[in-house]
């Protein structure tokens, strides 16, 4: 979602309000009151800080401003199937039905400077004597995302590890980590 926002002209310094949101479904009458994990609200927040802290209200407002349809189209350009993304604001909080492999492939686009690499599970097969039976061709690198956007998202995801919700990963002793935490029931 944040990559979509950057591609649409937002910056990591753009400010979005982290404040309570309440939606009532006009058909069912069900009320939705999403929360931040901390149960706190922080007011006007830069996107970099929001991503680092995993602030749900900013993320929902960002999706609302960009438009769910535009976001789903962007995800399709990144290689995801559009039918995995429900056309609702809860998609901002992770309501998409993607597999761990699909999610890892999506994040690899950032690690590869905006290029998508189609994953393969089997690199090669050898018989018991070491004779090669099968070897996967080198994966193609498909330009998918503006390298500038990729760099900025990677930088923000590194902040999430260094200073944000993913800081426990620093115990691995590596300085090249980037990541995003978060789960939802919304």
Show which residues each predicted segment covers.
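A penicillin-recognizing enzyme superfamily signal
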Residues: 11-12, 49, 53, 99-186
């Amino acid at each position: 979602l944040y990559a979509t926002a950057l591609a649409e002209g937002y910056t990591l310094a753009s400010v979005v309000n982290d404040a309570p949101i309440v939606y009532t479904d006009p058909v069912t009458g069900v009320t939705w009151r999403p929360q931040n994990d901390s149960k706190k609200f922080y007011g006007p927040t830069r996107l970099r800080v929001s991503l680092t802290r995993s602030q749900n209200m900013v993320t929902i407002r960002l999706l609302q401003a960009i438009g769910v349809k535009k976001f789903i189209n962007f995800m399709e350009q990144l290689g995801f199937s559009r039918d995995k993304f429900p056309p609702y604001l809860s998609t901002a909080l992770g309501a998409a039905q993607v597999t761990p492999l699909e999610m890892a492939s999506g994040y690899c686009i950032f690690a590869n400077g905006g290029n998508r690499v189609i994953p393969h599970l089997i690199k090669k097969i050898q018989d018991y004597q070491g004779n090669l039976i099968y070897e996967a061709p080198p994966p193609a690198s498909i330009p998918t995302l503006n390298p500038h956007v990729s760099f900025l998202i990677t930088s923000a995801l590194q902040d999430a590890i260094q200073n944000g919700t993913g800081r426990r990963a620093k115990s691995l002793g590596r300085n090249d980590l980037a990541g995003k935490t978060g789960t939802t029931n919304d």
